[in-house]
Amino acid sequence: MARSNVPKFGNWEAEENVPYTAYFDKARKTRAPGSKIMNPNDPEYNSDSQSQAPPHPPSSRTKPEQVDTVRRSREHMRSREESELKQFGDAGGSSNEAANKRQGRASQNNSYDNKSPLHKNSYDGTGKSRPKPTNLRADESPEKVTVVPKFGDWDENNPSSADGYTHIFNKVREERSSGANVSGSSRTPTHQSSRNPNNTSSCCCFGFGGK
């Protein structure tokens, strides 16, 4: 069944001799029973059709629960990173403190070794090696003995470390020469006393022969 085309309402000035009443009557007769008249040119007739339009697709906005979950996870990750950074900083500070303590103990040990008279290669703090002590003679006091340094014990890269070696060698030579004189004078009475038994024996022999 052909449906009559309802002319646009209010457009009668553009067209002449348009039988609007005939159009409306014909449209009323041809419409199905129980159906509702719809005019696409009139928004009032289309109010029901707009209400029956398919719903819009759901928006892509996240739910509040999801937002809270994401925020809590981010806060947890941030707090975890801060705690790890804090632990790393504490560990670095403790390691630095331990390293400083080790360096302090090492410097104390070095200073003790440098000042210790029993240390093999002890230094006087000026870069010069101390001369090594030698065995003292019984007839000499420790104050009068000049210790002979080991030959070549100075630092070849530091020429100033050999300063005073010539003076030490000359002094040692003088002390040894004076010590030889003292020891020679002390041996003289012993040599004379060793001759006394020969003299007495010769006298006895002469006396015995005279008799």
Swiss-Prot record:
Query: Which key words are in the record?
Result: Hypersensitive response, Immunity, Innate immunity, Lipoprotein, Membrane, Palmitate, Phosphoprotein, Plant defense
Phosphothreonine modification sites?
21, 166
Question: What InterPro entries would the database entry show?
Answer: RIN4/NOI4, TypeIII_avirulence_cleave
Q: In this chain, where does the modification Phosphoserine occur?
A: 79, 116, 141, 160
Q: Where is the lipid attached (S-palmitoyl cysteine)?
A: 203-205
According to its UniProt record, where is this protein located? Answer: Endomembrane system
Q: Could you tell me where the Polar residues compositional bias lies?
A: 105-114, 178-201
Where are the annotated coiled coils located?
none
Q: Per UniProt, what does mutating residue 166 to D do? A: Induction of RPM1 activation
What the entry lists under Pfam families is as follows: AvrRpt-cleavage
Q: What is the effect of changing residue 160 to D?
A: Induction of RPM1 activation
Q: Where is this site: Cleavage?
A: 10-11, 152-153
Instruction: Tell me the membrane topology, using the record's own terms.
Output: Peripheral membrane protein
Query: Could you mention a single GO BP entry for this protein?
Result: negative regulation of plant-type hypersensitive response
Q: What is the effect of changing residue 9 to A?
A: No cleavage at position 9-10 by AvrRpt2
A GO-annotated cellular component: endomembrane system
Post-translationally, this protein is described as follows, namely: Phosphorylated following the interaction with the Pseudomonas syringae effectors AvrB or AvrRpm1. Phosphorylated at Thr-21, Ser-160 and Thr-166 by RIPK following interaction with the effectors AvrB or AvrRpm1.
Region ranges (Disordered): 1-201
User: Where do Basic and acidic residues bias regions lie?
Assistant: 62-87
Q: Which domain of life is it from?
A: Eukaryota
Q: What does this protein do?
A: Essential regulator of plant defense, which plays a central role in resistance in case of infection by a pathogen. It is a common target for both type III avirulence proteins from P.syringae (AvrB, AvrRpm1 and AvrRpt2) and for the plant Resistance (R) proteins RPM1 and RPS2. In strains carrying the appropriate R gene for avirulence proteins of the pathogen, its association with avirulence proteins triggers a defense system including the hypersensitive response, which limits the spread of disease.
Q: What else is known?
A: Cleavage after Gly-152 by AvrRpt2 is critical for the release of RIN4 from the membrane and its subsequent proteasome-dependent elimination.
Q: Which family does it belong to?
A: Belongs to the RIN4 family.
Q: How does it assemble?
A: Interacts with the unrelated avirulence proteins AvrB, AvrRpm1 and AvrRpt2 from P.syringae. Interacts with the N-terminal domain of PRM1. Interacts indirectly with RPS2. Its association with AvrB and AvrRpm1 results in its phosphorylation, which is in turn recognized by the resistance RPM1 protein, leading to the activation of RPM1-dependent disease resistance responses. On the other hand, its association with AvrRpt2 results in its destruction, which activates RPS2-dependent disease resistance responses. Interacts (via C-terminus) with NDR1.
Record-given protein name: RPM1-interacting protein 4
State the taxonomy lineage: Eukaryota, Viridiplantae, Streptophyta, Embryophyta, Tracheophyta
